[in-house]
Amino acid sequence: MGMSGPYQELEVQTRVALLEQMRGQYSNADAEAAYADNGAVNRHVSEVLKRGRNFEKDLFSIYIDASISDKRAAVATAVADYLGDDRHSVATVPKESTYLIEHDQANGFKTAFPLLSGFLWTQQWLQLAALEAVILENLDNQFANGVDVALERFWNKIGSAGGMSMFPAPSELPMAPAIAPDLYSQSEEAAMIIDNLNILETVITDILAYPNVENRGELIDAAVTKFTSKDTEDTQQMDYLLFALRGGIYNQGGPAVGELMQSERNRSRSAMNMQHSMIMSTPQ
């Protein structure tokens, strides 16, 4: 994410402030309060995002708990508990794959704030990479300390404007089939929840960053409704997998463990017949 946006100075200042916050120590209550105090979105949206964060926390807790022998059953229970609040939970089926890059405000955040976009996607990469690392640790001792490796790579990615060349910040949205394939193999539903949450977060930031939008609240509510709807499966599973993998492992932040020194893809998602033509008006 080395490109410059129109608000580079503001982005750099914001990243410095965010890094200071991230290095602090916070309780679970502090984290939940941060969602409630968010003035950018309404209470319903905050609750959806908070519930998603708690699901991700519960999922990681299952995999690091040595006393839980049947991880798959525990994950299935966590998924069922998460879905127990239908209004504030996203679907466990893939939504329309190209919605991320074809909705009217698509790429708004990445275009206006490329450094912060990479910052957000790096956070999402860590969610998936940490889960993949701890699952691998449970499967094979050769992957011991994988979570520490993933965490070190995370700090390398956000330690500078563009990240280190060996472990650059993601230039594509990280998705479970690419970054956490073992999670996807063990629980497609859990992986889909995380991917739907991360896509929704990206869509929300696109809407918030897009200039001269008068109905941001309505657009965000519509996006949340789309992702929390359980009535229809908007895309086929294979289309979802193709979309996830077309982003490339390297471009999505690289593997949690192991090495991948360059992109294994020669085209991005947007270049593979997934191009969104965005015309942004002058920022106010």
PLM features: what roles do these ranges have?
Residues M1-Q284:
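Polar/charged low-complexity regulatory segments
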